[in-house]
A protein has these predicted regions:
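Active-site-adjacent helix-turn-beta-strand microarchitecture at beta-sheet edges
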Residues: 1-31, 121-131, 139-144
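Residues that form generic nucleotide/phosphate-binding pockets
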Residues: 17-24, 28, 39, 65, ...
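Feature captures C-terminal
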Residues: 56-148
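Short acidic (Asp/Glu) and glycine-rich catalytic loops that position anionic groups and cofactors
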Residues: 1, 36-42, 91-98
């Protein structure tokens, strides 16, 4: 490894070319897409320990998009909160920055219960901790049992 220069000199022509795309990106990111009357909670220290309004919103949106009975979203895929006030496209990308897709599949009642037992008993403070929509359940971690 040989370091020829501490810094690569800027190329004014390249900067000019890239500025056009940067400006277009900035305009898209700053577009207002909504307004909130309260905070949508997605802070890692909260969403990986308990159900939140943002987790429910995302799970519900995915449930509706898939026309499913329930929606489940892993907390690790939610990366930020959205504060009260105007919401921009950038805010949306900050909370959900991955190129994930919504998956839909059919399960028997037993398969669903088996799946929920596995998901519900994942360690809190883990990205696997699930946010739910369309179901209500209680998890007894001491007994390692799920009640729906």
């Amino acid at each position: 490894y040989v370091n020829y220069a501490e810094e690569i000199p800027q190329d004014p022509e390249m900067e000019k070319l890239l500025k056009t795309y940067q400006d277009k990106g900035d305009a898209l990111l700053s577009q207002k897409v909504g307004k909130l009357k309260g905070k949508l909670e997605g802070d890692r220290t909260i969403i990986r320990f308990e159900q939140t309004n943002l987790g429910h919103l995302i799970a519900e949106a995915q449930r509706q998009k898939a026309k499913a009975d329930i929606g489940i979203m892993n907390s690790g895929g939610i990366r930020d909160s959205i504060q009260e006030g105007d919401v921009t496209y950038k805010d949306i990308l900050k909370i959900h920055p991955f190129g994930n897709i919504v998956s839909y599949f059919e399960l028997t009642g037993k398969e669903l219960l088996d799946y929920l037992n596995v998901v519900a008993l994942k360690e809190v403070d883990s990205g696997a901790y699930a946010q739910y929509s369309g179901i209500s359940m209680t998890v007894n971690r001491a007994d390692r049992k799920l009640k729906m």
